[in-house]
Amino acid sequence: DGYSDIAFRPGIWYVMPVTRADHMQFVGGIANKSIVQTHLFYLDLMDDIYSTYRAVQPGETPFPFTDVPESRWSYPYIKQLYDAGVVSGMTATTFAPAENMTRAQFVTMLAGLQGADVSAYRTGKFTDVPADAWYAPYVSWAAENGVVYGVSDTAFAPGADISRQDMAVMVYRYAECFGIRLGTDVPPVTFADTGDIAAYALPAVQALQRAGVISGMPDGSFRPREHMTREQACVVLSAL
């Protein structure tokens, strides 16, 4: 495109000519304990051939979801992931925080958290994931990287609501696959319903609990087969 990469610094203004045939693209960043969030740039086209833009600090980023007011308990977690480009809404102005999270939606969030380029992932082993489905490249990315194995050798159940124990398994595998160290600082807890946790999910649940990624329900249970809501998923991923 003729332009060089630029290292932006706070407090420094940069001017670059942009014609109407050109465009600028926001490349989302990741907000976690070890990676600093990138800046978001707004591009305002003027009447002439020049354009102006400014760096917007994370706190200034417009938050569009009217169903997630600042008073809602999950607001800071949802906003953190939204600012980082990890999550999007069900519509332009709603997030549906209390709705159940589907398996396809969750792997999409994991890909966003990783900052993965899923454009090359177009085919997969799951017969219930059409190649032209919006979630197909995300599911394929997750499968090829060992984050998910599916509900069977050939099925993923993308539209099914994800259970809390399956969420734990995906997050645990995600951490393993991408070298995310899970701490062990939190004392181990035996959930009141530990016996209800499937054998395949128990190691993941225990590891995430010791890492402080999950803490269970207020009554001391984990409710492994209960569905995870969209806001609960944001709380989990913001802890990574």
Predicted regions and their residues:
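Mature N-terminal segment immediately following signal peptide/propeptide cleavage
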Residues: K79-A84
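Feature responds to low-complexity, polar/acidic, surface-exposed segments characteristic
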Residues: M46-Y75, S88-V107, A111-Y138, E144-A168, ...
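A glycine-anchored, Pro-Gly-centered beta-turn/N-cap motif
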Residues: R9-I12
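Structured interaction patches on ligand/partner-binding surfaces of diverse proteins
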Residues: D22-S51, A142, L208
